[in-house]
């Protein structure tokens, strides 16, 4: 039985933790995660999903900073043979990597070397990739550049959000992850160097990145919305009274409008506007459309500043928008 230490923090790491804990080939001797963080309106300290799961499973938890002497002492006391790390949220220094004899192995949500970095699933959706996947690779000091031990590939539907894609990859990747590390322990694993071609970086998506430019084409905005859902959330500024006609300046202070779901407008629907200017709003009885750099985009779910998430048509009726209302 391999003694395994597991490092992870968010929900996407939980299926893998549960899979290792349930597999008789492994003894999960410890779980490393980030410290409790303030959440919600009350800013109450809350354990990470991985810590909460570890405590439910009766597993010892280390939630110290990885560069502290106390962390190294706690890690060494586990006497782990092998380590799994998935979405931990901290860079592991060399002394930590060297402390586990068989090494550290990461489950990464792309087919490497494409989309190395922090947001692989999000970037795959935003780019309109037809496929993506998950790889298990040995962690080194470089960024996601270690040899691959196992890999799976899936087709994208073209309608999933990044949250849905991550959930799917987390579930489908977990059994592969467990089998890959078992093979490493048994000495039967194959280590394949990453190809030299096809390298792209999946930089973290910032709040400013998530702001919609309505001069982009409808299909591109649709991908942006899905890539940014649920985090950080695609958004725009709503000018409910519209611009002033003589100088095109907004008539009132704008409000933030989060776009939770949208899709390129159905051009076969007779109610769909034939043409709208970028950012121009058109409200129908059951639909809300926005002009883009190509065809209109239909908004299906939104969250206005200070309001709850709701169907776009319901929001528009309650907002009592001026006919000149626009988004920018």
From Swiss-Prot:
User: GO molecular function of the protein, one example?
Assistant: methionyl-tRNA formyltransferase activity
Listed under GO cellular component are:
cytosol
Q: Which Gene3D superfamilies match?
A: Formyl transferase, C-terminal domain, Formyl transferase, N-terminal domain
Note the superkingdom of the native organism. Answer: Bacteria
Keyword annotations from UniProtKB, A to Z: Protein biosynthesis, Transferase
Protein's UniProt keywords contain Transcription regulation: no
Listed InterPro entries: Fmt, Formyl_trans_C, Formyl_trans_C_sf, Formyl_transf_N, Formyl_transf_N_sf, Formyl_transferase-like_C_sf, Met-tRNA-FMT_C, Met-tRNA-FMT_N
The keyword Nucleotide-binding belongs to this UniProt entry's keyword annotation: no
Catalysed transformations (reactions): L-methionyl-tRNA(fMet) + (6R)-10-formyltetrahydrofolate = N-formyl-L-methionyl-tRNA(fMet) + (6S)-5,6,7,8-tetrahydrofolate + H(+)
Question: Known EC number(s)?
Answer: 2.1.2.9
Residues that, per the record, bind (6S)-5,6,7,8-tetrahydrofolate? 110-113
Q: What class of enzyme is it?
A: transferase
Q: Hey, what's the signal peptide range on this chain?
A: none
Q: What does this protein do?
A: Attaches a formyl group to the free amino group of methionyl-tRNA(fMet). The formyl group appears to play a dual role in the initiator identity of N-formylmethionyl-tRNA by promoting its recognition by IF2 and preventing the misappropriation of this tRNA by the elongation apparatus.
The family database entries (PANTHER family) matched by this protein are listed as: METHIONYL-TRNA FORMYLTRANSFERASE (PTHR11138), METHIONYL-TRNA FORMYLTRANSFERASE, MITOCHONDRIAL (PTHR11138:SF5)
Q: Which family does it belong to?
A: Belongs to the Fmt family.
| NCBIfam families the record matches | fmt (TIGR00460)
* Identification of the protein by name: Methionyl-tRNA formyltransferase
Q: Which organism is it from?
A: Bifidobacterium longum (strain NCC 2705)
